[in-house]
Swiss-Prot record:
Ranges of Low complexity composition bias in the record: 149-162, 174-183
Annotated protein name in UniProt: DELLA protein RGA2
Post-translational modification as stated in the protein's UniProt record: Phosphorylated. Ubiquitinated. Upon GA application it is ubiquitinated, leading to its subsequent degradation.
SAW as annotated region, ranges: 498-574
GO molecular function: DNA-binding transcription factor activity; sequence-specific DNA binding
Name of the coding gene: RGA2
UniProt keyword terms in alphabetical order: Gibberellin signaling pathway, Nucleus, Phosphoprotein, Repressor, Transcription, Transcription regulation, Ubl conjugation
Chain ranges for the short sequence motif LXXLL motif as given in the UniProt record: 416-420
Protein family (similarity comment): Belongs to the GRAS family. DELLA subfamily.
Organism: Brassica campestris (Field mustard)
Domain topic, free-text comment: The DELLA motif is required for its GA-induced degradation.
Function recorded in the entry: Probable transcriptional regulator that acts as a repressor of the gibberellin (GA) signaling pathway. Probably acts by participating in large multiprotein complexes that represses transcription of GA-inducible genes. Upon GA application, it is degraded by the proteasome, allowing the GA signaling pathway.
Region Leucine repeat II (LRII), residue ranges: 364-396
Region VHIID: start-end pairs: 285-350
Keyword Nucleus (UniProt): yes
Amino acid sequence: MKRDLHQFQGPPDTRFPNHGTANTGSSSKDKMMMVKEEEDGGNMDELLAVLGYKVRSSEMAEVALKLEQLETMMGNVQEDGLSNLATDTVHYNPSELYSWLDNMLTEFNPPPPEINNSFLAGAGGSDYDLKAIPGNAIYARSDQFAIDSSSSSNQAGDNSQSTKRLKSCSSPDSLVTGTTVTTTTTESTRSVGLAAESTRSMVLVDSQENGVRLVHALMACAEAIQNNDLSIAEALVKQIGFLAVSQAGAMRKVATYFAEALARRIYRLSPPQTQIDHSLSDTLQMHFYETCPYLKFAHFTANQAILEAFEGKKRVHVIDFSMNQGLQWPALMQALALREGGPPVFRLTGIGPPAADNSDHLHEVGCKLAQLAEAIHVEFEYRGFVANSLADLDASMLELRPSEIEAVAVNSVFELHKLLGRTGGIEKVLGVVKQIKPVIFTVVEQESSHNGPVFLDRFTESLHYYSTLFDSLEGVPSSQDKVMSEVYLGKQICNLVACEGPDRVERHETLSQWANRFGSSGFAPAHLGSNAFKQASMLLALFNGGEGYRVEENNGCLMLGWHTRPLITTSAWKLSAAH
């Protein structure tokens, strides 16, 4: 195939006398011979040299890589106003292609501005572009964490490594991958991606190194926000988005949601807290219910405790603090219908937020449950209450009947933590529950500490927690339910990271913290039986064969986790003898 050399013409080069002139009489063979003579000293690629590009054969792979990097950058910088990299800008073909690519990549990622050395901790000789990270988020200890992508990545000369699963670690140096993590105590600089390779290109080939830099950038951005270094945080959040592109699966999704949340906090763009948002969350929760076992586990274990507490009762009443779409109650109604001696009269009071369109959605849920009750021959009473907050409830509103006539159970799934941002809110609700005098009070909450006073600690804990949750979703086949479930979790991340004060409602606490709250309010634990444990384990077998999920009994409570990390906890409570 012949080409007209005019279209490939570059700047004149004294090493090639005929280059840069329109000498149609010279043949390609002559040029190839001239290149061959020069190659004896420079080992230049023949075909590219004919076209006027000087590239050593040994540099071909690097040049190809840099071209890929430049192409990626050119697609990303349009909106940043870097006209010299815009796709519609003309660049004359350079002769020194390798150097030209280096210069272009350097322009895209210029050296960071001078900063106070007090931000650095043990920077050493590294020229890594993220050396402006404040505090110890990057340069902390020598025993840094490195992502264990495969055992083949370990060099033969490396020291032995110990493998462990992610738990409720709050150290800012731990890296969340959603999978197994390896602790490395040697060559820590290389492990955390601070190797002495060129820092100018932010398009990184090695996904493992990218993952390390990504998580450290997330931690550093959170630390900068806590220190009110918003200019550094702004620069880091942009790099987080760029680094996240190189990742796959759960890590990419988690990093993207956390990057959005960090950006909202930096620019003070709080997510909406409106009735429309409540309605959307309700819909998203339905998709989450269909996708994974967490809500099913919550409903099943709570129902089992309620069913046992109602044994032998002729009239029973459930007050549900988390009515939503009423997904929990068909299973309990069917179990009551099959009870030996016949079903009791079942009364249900559902409490939920107002609808965006002022429709009576709680009434609609009640009508559907009434149809089911009629079909299975259960006498059914229902009433719905609309409340902006559970703290607005009063026991007198609930039309309580004497305990000799009607046994009452109170149920709350993922609701009580939302009261912790309102002064006196949780105390008010627990006081109402005490007035109700239920035979059992079932509570399901996220098993994590997201309500501490220090932002960086909350951020670190939430990064671990949601990375594990997203990792557990990776085995689910792709579907609309899965996508919407990820959005459901992403909204929680956004609220937890971007909001403060009463707007921050995702204030999850651990079982021990809740136990202290309930104990000080006059409640004692009601242990869930071994039967609930066995049946919950059987339920999980329906999801991916139960692989990866784990049920654990802890002081009479049941925890569902992914591998060794507990994620949600079901507990049951009753009034202590003193009350």
